[in-house]
C-alpha cells in the first residue's frame, strides 16, 4: 500500500513539474531525448539477450518440430508404400493360388473321369467274363444232364444227329 502511495505521489509531481519548462519559455527536449536514449540503451543491454535467446530457442523449437513432423510424414509414406506393395503381393499370390486351384480341379476331374471310365470298363469286362463263365457252367450242366439221361436209358439207341440235336435243344 505504501508503494502505491509513493508511486502516485511521484507520478503526480512529474506531471506538475513537466509544465514548468514550457511555462518559463524554455524547452527540455534535449534532456528528455538523452534520458530516453539512456533508458533505451539500458533496456537493450538488459533485455536484448534474453529476447534474442527466447526467439532463437523458439525458432529452433519450431524447426525441430517441423523436422520431426517431416520425418513422421516420410515414415508414414514409406509405411504406406510398403503396405501397398505387400497388398499387391498378397493379391498376386491369391490370384496364383486361385489359378493353381483351378488347374488342380481340372486335373483331378480328368483323373476321376479316367478312373471311373477304367472301372466301368473293368466291371463290363468282369461282367462279360462272369456271363461267359455262367454260360459255360450252364452248357456243362446241361451236357452232363443230357449225358446222364442218355446213359440211364441204355436201351435207347440214338444216332449221332439226334444226339447233337438233343444237346442243341437243351443248350438253347
UniProtKB/Swiss-Prot annotation:
GO terms for cellular component: plasma membrane; proton-transporting ATP synthase complex. The keyword Transport applies. Its main location: membrane. It is a single-pass membrane protein. One of its GO terms (molecular function) is proton-transporting ATPase activity, rotational mechanism. It comes from the Bacteria. It is found in: Cell inner membrane. The chain crosses the membrane at residues 5-24. Belongs to the ATPase B chain family. F-type ATPases have 2 components, F(1) - the catalytic core - and F(0) - the membrane proton channel. F(1) has five subunits: alpha(3), beta(3), gamma(1), delta(1), epsilon(1). F(0) has three main subunits: a(1), b(2) and c(10-14). The alpha and beta chains form an alternating ring which encloses part of the gamma chain. F(1) is attached to F(0) by a central stalk formed by the gamma and epsilon chains, while a peripheral stalk is formed by the delta and b chains. This is ATP synthase subunit b. It comes from Nitratiruptor sp. (strain SB155-2). The gene is atpF.
